[in-house]
Amino acid sequence: MKLFTGLIFCSLVLGVSSQWYSFIGEAVQGAWDMYRAYSDMREANYKNSDKYFHARGNYDAAQRGPGGAWAAKVISDARERSQRVTDLFKYGDSGHGVEDSKADQAANEWGRSGKDPNHFRPSGLPDKY
């Protein structure tokens, strides 16, 4: 009986730990997706494209699974919080205030919810992105 109980307990522990490995892997890949979208946004330097890249990064990360969606939310929220702080010191350089931050968060949520990020894609943005 003790052997049976031990085997059940070990299988439960291993099952839970494998879920954590999956979550962590998804989170790392999701963070990479967010970085890639940010890097593409900086490279493209295309007017009115930031909402598209916000939505795309969140969409790509969320497609990884719960870990990717979690990473996308954490990174997006941290980015918007830091933007609000920098706006206090240098308005306009890091965004356009509260309205822009709310629009960014809406684009983030749009992407995380699985909706098509191309909804925010500006016309004329090169196909590379």
Curated annotation (Swiss-Prot):
One of the GO BP terms on file: acute-phase response
Expressing tissues: Expressed by the liver; secreted in plasma.
Residues the record lists as Pyrrolidone carboxylic acid modifications: 19
The keyword Signal appears for this protein: yes
Protein localization: Secreted
Region annotation (Disordered) ranges: 92-129
Keywords: Acute phase, Amyloid, HDL, Pyrrolidone carboxylic acid, Secreted, Signal
InterPro entries: Serum_amyloid_A, Synovial_Prolif_Regulator
Entry keyword annotation includes Iron-sulfur: no
GO-annotated cellular components: high-density lipoprotein particle
Segments passing through the bilayer: none
Gene3D superfamilies the UniProt entry points to: Serum amyloid A protein
Assembly information from the UniProt record: Apolipoprotein of the HDL complex.
Function: Major acute phase reactant.
Family membership: Belongs to the SAA family.
Name of the protein in its database record: Serum amyloid A-2 protein
Species per Swiss-Prot/TrEMBL record: Neovison vison
Lineage, opening ranks: Eukaryota, Metazoa, Chordata, Craniata, Vertebrata
